[in-house]
Amino acid sequence: MQALVIVGHGSHLNPGSSEPAYTHADTIRESGAFDEVREAFWKEEPSFRNVLRTLESDEVYVVPLFISEGYFTEQVIPRELRLDDFDPDDWDSDGTDADHVTLEADDVEKTIHYCGPVGTHDSMSEVIVQRASSVTGREEFGDDFGLAVVGHGTERNENSAKAIYYHADQIREMGVFGEVQAVFMDEDPEVDDVTDFFDTDDIVVVPLFVSDGFHTQEDIPEDMGLTDDYRTGYDIPTAVDGHDIWYSGAVGTEPLAADVVLERAADAGAPVGDAVDAVREQTRGANAAAGD
């Protein structure tokens, strides 16, 4: 038997923090790609520490629903899963290309395929573009539309910014938008000044966050000038400094993000069959239905 475990941060304060993990788990569960699909969290139950004990499968694919490589993916998750032989160097990553490593969890007698985070997978760029399509209702953009990919940014983890720049570069090479920029909450270039970085009339702003919470629902809209008080709401798009800003909310809530989880497991050797294509078709259908 084979199992998939999606591990997320969770929150004691924001019940929506875990929602993407449950939603994407349900999507993958319906595909039938795995005998078991579980969710586990740092700040909620079921916990990282106990999740492996809930599985009957002897082979487990663990996919972190995190944006970047760093403290949680390199220290907390391996420690809590008791992957004693894990070494971040085994990923041979420069901060954006962690793949997977196979280890034994001896206390539960299971083989664990520990994957890199969803946020640095190549296919996340496609999810960002799809998120932009979902908020604008457009399948094509062209030179009149710019895209701002928003990250948290932090001096404590340089990989946090690397993931944002990585996807901004990839999307720029796709030629989908007239302009593509990476911006941040806590470092330059700052999201507060997003209109300064674009000549396009329309700017789609997509936060590379797993879930919607205080940053995506309160801080970023106010920082960009969409509203003085998030509680009063704002229009989509909102005119700011001569530009129309289309703000999408967290990319991790996009249904297509389930595909990234599945692709991470497939890259680690999970025999998912045609589940990737099935999930892509299902999640794109969800987007179309939402736009009706």
Curated annotation (Swiss-Prot):
Record protein name field: Probable sirohydrochlorin cobaltochelatase
UniProt similarity note: Belongs to the CbiX family. CbiXS subfamily.
Reactions performed catalytically: Co-sirohydrochlorin + 2 H(+) = sirohydrochlorin + Co(2+)
Pfam families in the cross-refs: CbiX
Organism, as annotated: Halobacterium salinarum (strain ATCC 700922 / JCM 11081 / NRC-1) (Halobacterium halobium)
Notes on the domains: Seems to consist of two fused copies of the CbiX domain, resembling CbiK arrangement.
Chain intervals for the UniProt region annotation (CbiX 2): 142-292
Classification via PANTHER family: SIROHYDROCHLORIN FERROCHELATASE, CHLOROPLASTIC
Pathway: Cofactor biosynthesis; adenosylcobalamin biosynthesis; cob(II)yrinate a,c-diamide from sirohydrochlorin (anaerobic route): step 1/10
